[in-house]
Amino acid sequence: MSEQQQNITDLTLTELQQALSLLGEPAFRATQIHQWLFSHHAASFEEMTILSLALRKKLSESFSIHPLKRVEHQECFEEDCESPTEKILLELQDKSRVESVLIATENRRTACVSSQIGCPLQCPFCATGQMGFRRNLTAGEITGQIYALNELVGAKEPGKSLTNIVFMGMGEPLLNTGNVIEAIETLSTRNYRFCLSQKRITISTVGVIPEIQRLGKSGMKTKLAVSLHAADQQKRESLMPIASRQYPLKELGTALSEYTQSTGMPVTIVYLLLKGINDSLDDAKMLARFSKTFLCKINLIDYNSIINIKFKPVYSATRDMFQQYLINSGLHVTIRKSYGTTINAACGQLATASMQNPQ
């Protein structure tokens, strides 16, 4: 099978119908093929026994099916969870690699998936940003992560499946919006065995304003989380230099206000507390002022240590002071627990030496 063949899982139903038409096949075959791909997770065309031998031959000559290959699997147990947090390293068709995480708590089984190989935004506190940007993931590579994590769930809890998906892995989802939306539409359609409500899917972004506006007009029901980390423009530029200069705070606040008004849904503001940098009372006051301009809730996150990166987490007393000021200001604030820190699976940690392509 030629590696130059297009992976058929990257085609939308309409695109597959058009491709089959060129092969002289009726449109309804596309639905049958998608059922085999997304309900039965067929790893080869030979498994699609409902199709004729002649059609299977045509498909194998024109397309490939390339399931993501698991090359590494790590897990660690959290104090308050019976099930471990699990991280998998997946190899793609071009031998690139990407990490995905399964977070299992009492009532939820959450997939944390990647949208890019590396990240172009170069935030200095994030391991993924230090590995540079290689390429966007295709829709098929995104859904492939979900199916790989869902298999982990089913192996340990027969009959169970993922309950939530968060696009908080490697990369900036809203710099790959088209493929992310296509993957979400596949994962949330009732046409396939795996069907998850869009309300259980969260897209995290640094604040890519044009794409936030696009989401607001799309009619999608996904949740939106915005990584803010500072409510002062100059300070945010030091922490998120590329994102903050391209999408300034003032314009971002306006876009989020318009988003919440058009969708009726709150935005989650994610704020990573860094010792001596963005953890002062003045920082809390600026965050409160910014967040009161639109419907939102705030997630405070403790910094997860990363090798060769010198930021430090705040003391618990500082974090509590910061949180209490926001609460006293009338805001809804939670401290988000980090999972998988010991296996570098927590927020900002996805990128290790094993991410390098094998020599």
UniProtKB/Swiss-Prot annotation:
Keyword list, A-Z: 4Fe-4S, Cytoplasm, Disulfide bond, Iron, Iron-sulfur, Metal-binding, Methyltransferase, rRNA processing, S-adenosyl-L-methionine, Transferase, tRNA processing
Enzyme Commission code: 2.1.1.192
GO CC annotations on file: cytoplasm
Classification of source organism: Bacteria, Pseudomonadati, Chlorobiota, Chlorobiia, Chlorobiales
Name the record gives this protein: Probable dual-specificity RNA methyltransferase RlmN
InterPro entries linked: Aldolase_TIM, Methyltransferase_A, RlmN_N, RNA_MTrfase_RlmN, rRNA_lsu_MTrfase_RlmN/Cfr, rSAM
All residue ranges annotated as the Radical SAM core domain in the record: 105-342
Top-level taxon in the UniProt lineage: Bacteria
Localization in the cell: Cytoplasm
Function (record text): Specifically methylates position 2 of adenine 2503 in 23S rRNA and position 2 of adenine 37 in tRNAs.
Residues binding [4Fe-4S] cluster: C119, C123, C126
Active-site residue list: E99 (proton acceptor), C347 (s-methylcysteine intermediate)
